[in-house]
Amino acid sequence: MGNPFEGWPVHDIVYTVIVGLVMLAAVLEWFLWVAAFMYCLVKVFIKAEHWTIRALAVVVAILFVGFRAVFLPIMVVTLPLPSAIVKLWPEDMVVGLQWFAFWAFAGLLTIPWLFCVYHFVTNQLGREKRVKQVLDEVSAPKVVIVMPCYKEDPEVLLVAMNSIVDCDYPPSCIHVFLSFDGDQVDELYLNTIETFGVPLTLDSYPKSIDVTYKAARITISRFPHGGKRHCQKATFKLIDKVYKEYLERNDNLFILFIDSDCILDRVCLQNFIYDMELSPGNSRDMLAMTGVITSTTKKHSLITVLQDLEYIHGQLFERTVESGCGAVTCLPGALTMLRFSAFRRMAKYYFADKAEQCEDLFDFAKCHLGEDRWLTHLFMIGAKKRYQIQMCTSAFCKTEAVQTMQSLVKQRRRWFLGFITNEVCMLTDWRLWTRYPLLVLIRFMQNTIRTTALLFFIMVLAILTTSKRVSDLPVGFIAISLGLNWLMMIYFGAKLRRFKIWLYPLMFVLNPFFNWWYMVYGIFTAGQRTWGGPRADAAAADGDTTAQQAIEAAEKAGDDLNIVPETFIPAAQIKRKESGRRRIVAGGNIQPSAKIDGMFAIPERGANGWYQHDNISLFTVAHGHTGRVPLHPRDSFDSFLSAQTALNSVYIPRRVESIMGDEDRRKYELAQASQFNQFLSNQRRSTNGEPPQGQVYEYSDVDLQKAGYTDNPLPPTPGETASAVPAALNLHHKVGSTDSLVSLGSSASNSNQRDRGRQRTLMPPTSSQARTGRSPLGRASFLRTSTIEDIELEIGTSHGSSANRPALSRQASNNDPNNSNSGGHQQR
């Protein structure tokens, strides 16, 4: 038998051996991607609640396998193989397949590229300030920032907090909710409050306290440990309680979710608000936006550089394409801003404890590992029209890059499993096909050509081994796939002055190998768990261990897939049976419930000027006892853990001065003065020593009356004359933006000492006028400090007769020595 390589040049033999190995890797990747995608489609078909889901699962499966099968021969004939092999292919077949591949790839790469170009022509890219006028307490909407914290490094947490309060945004319009996932007073908690100027000489600390840090209000809370989602849920309950009355008068409250290790850019907040509220001609119906998350590191390496390139390309290219097609498909928890009035309508679905509804690993990957995508799917169904869930390319933040290869692989495995499960759920949702047809079509086609990037490496190898000349390669394919993307990355680097992203060809060559390893590792480990069963040491839920505790145990052990999700529902049923609750725990829906269709929307404003919320928020907390609202067993419900802590974990925040002695209060005031002076010096430095150009014109009595605002017809207390407006608003002078902070605080403090016993209510205009997004309440927060006596009276009132409740409430208000309006606990 003759030698098959007889007559072959040596370089062709070496090239063929190397290419053979790469082709085997590419074929393995091709097969695993098809197998994983089809497995998810089968799971969706089995779990489907509606016939349209099953029908779409069958159609998507047929088209997906068909397109993938076509690309197998294309991959073979496109590769620059030695001439001894190429001559075996029929010439007509080779030409036809190559032209089909060229136009298919050209369309799938060029059309999204044009969407990206259009986005940056019509929207601004970069960290430049977009708001032309100086924002003040009147013109700037209120922003509440939710930052959950769990065992974070104190220095990292302080940097994140400083990045928020140092933003170019009126401090009086910033309210940070720093929530610790754990109610113990530990070293991290004490170090944090000490940084904010709180003395560490107190005997005890309330569960929720208010401090002022660099002129911004910060509410520091400790909640029972239950995970990030539970911590955010408890924080939302607190926000909804504090701002309940404010939302009845205004629709200019926004909520920003960030992580405790994120560093906000200086103009991040105001650029978010510009796109959602303040831009010229804004219809003010934007519901959710995400920004640009970049990576930062103290020590550079190849891994960190590739992550930075991937972050920039994935967000500024892929997410802007999605944004141009109607909606982004992932709102990351690290940087997402939502319109609060619309979000509270979705809260009970957003914060539902999906871990207890997991039947298998598919549900666990969809709802836990890929919760950001799952929750974005909820919002896409909840929105009434396209272009309400968008990308803000001028709002930036930084997060720490993963430093080790082991951590990176586990992170990407988590991302991959969350991506593929939610991607299949989106492709089989008929509502998305009708509302976002172009977006879903592009997502589907991109999934069909996924895992073909290894071909470019083979082309480069052909040139390096001189097996082929450049003229023998598919130059058009290379020019489109690499050239267009590199051109865009060059523009990004020049615009952002981030020149290392010009190294995009490095990512283009190396990333296919990293992505290959992420996919193979993720599918094999998940497949081993699916078909081989859980390991003996896998974390399981039972009567003593909740689903969340089992998940945390697996993560602590270093493998978040080493769990037994099949035990989650039985464990939850045991818990509910022990608690006397008869509700049966069922598995979660494969698609968002039909109940939320169109629910993610702004409430209507009534003829009297008030916004009609209709008690739509599950977590709206009344001033007295709040009963639990039963939820649908499949759509959403509170976990047993949340149910036991819901009534004792949310407290009205107390001003920290109210729990201090005279000496501690004096020290705290000195610390506050030092912080405020530092804040003013930083403001002057940022404006080159010049005061802000904007002016704050306080409303006079006549102006308020012309606008339609009136006082409640409450009789004045003895020895006091009635005023047309609350004293905190009745400032008959105009001051600069910075000075208004000082004058507003001092005026409110002086007025509170005169008006301790009574608070007035500012009535909204009675005319039905267009929403302006501004209100005199935007300048200040009105607060009633909740003392122990208040809480006791409140609890007693909730169990007393309804006829006695108003009298008890007024008596508590009149007898409270700490009842003041300075700072903003209870919104009026």
Curated annotation (Swiss-Prot):
UniProt keyword annotations, A-Z: Glycoprotein, Glycosyltransferase, Membrane, Transferase, Transmembrane, Transmembrane helix, Virulence
Chief localization: membrane
Top-level lineage group: Eukaryota
Topology relative to the membrane: Multi-pass membrane protein
The protein's enzyme class: transferase
Keyword Heme: no
Cellular-component GO terms for this entry: cell periphery; cell septum; membrane
Catalytic reactions on record: [(1->4)-N-acetyl-beta-D-glucosaminyl](n) + UDP-N-acetyl-alpha-D-glucosamine = [(1->4)-N-acetyl-beta-D-glucosaminyl](n+1) + UDP + H(+)
Low complexity bias: start-end ranges: 740-752, 813-822
Induction: Transcription is regulated by the CON7 transcription factor. Expression is strongly induced on germination of spores and during appressoria maturation.
Disruption phenotype: Does not affect vegetative growth. Does not significantly changes in the chitin content in vegetative hyphae, nor in conidia. Abolishes the ability to form appressoria on artificial surfaces, except following the application of the exogenous inducers 1,16-hexadecanediol and cyclic adenosine monophosphate. The appressoria formed have a reduced chitin content and are smaller and misshapen. Also reduces the ability to enter rice plants, but does not affect growth in planta.
Subcellular localization, as worded in the UniProt entry: Membrane
Sequence intervals crossing the membrane: 17-37, 57-77, 95-115, 444-464, 473-493, 501-521
An example Gene Ontology biological process: chitin biosynthetic process
Glycosylated residues, chain numbering: 615, 818
Enzyme Commission designation: 2.4.1.16
Gene Ontology MF: a single term: chitin synthase activity
Region (Disordered): 740-780, 793-828
Pfam families noted in UniProt: Chitin_synth_2
Family membership: Belongs to the chitin synthase family. Class VII subfamily.
PANTHER family per UniProt: CHITIN SYNTHASE (PTHR22914:SF46)
Function, as annotated: Polymerizes chitin, a structural polymer of the cell wall and septum, by transferring the sugar moiety of UDP-GlcNAc to the non-reducing end of the growing chitin polymer. Required for normal appressorial chitin content and for the normal formation and function of these infection structures.
Name the UniProt record assigns to this protein: Chitin synthase 7
Organism of derivation: Pyricularia oryzae (strain 70-15 / ATCC MYA-4617 / FGSC 8958)
Gene: CHS7
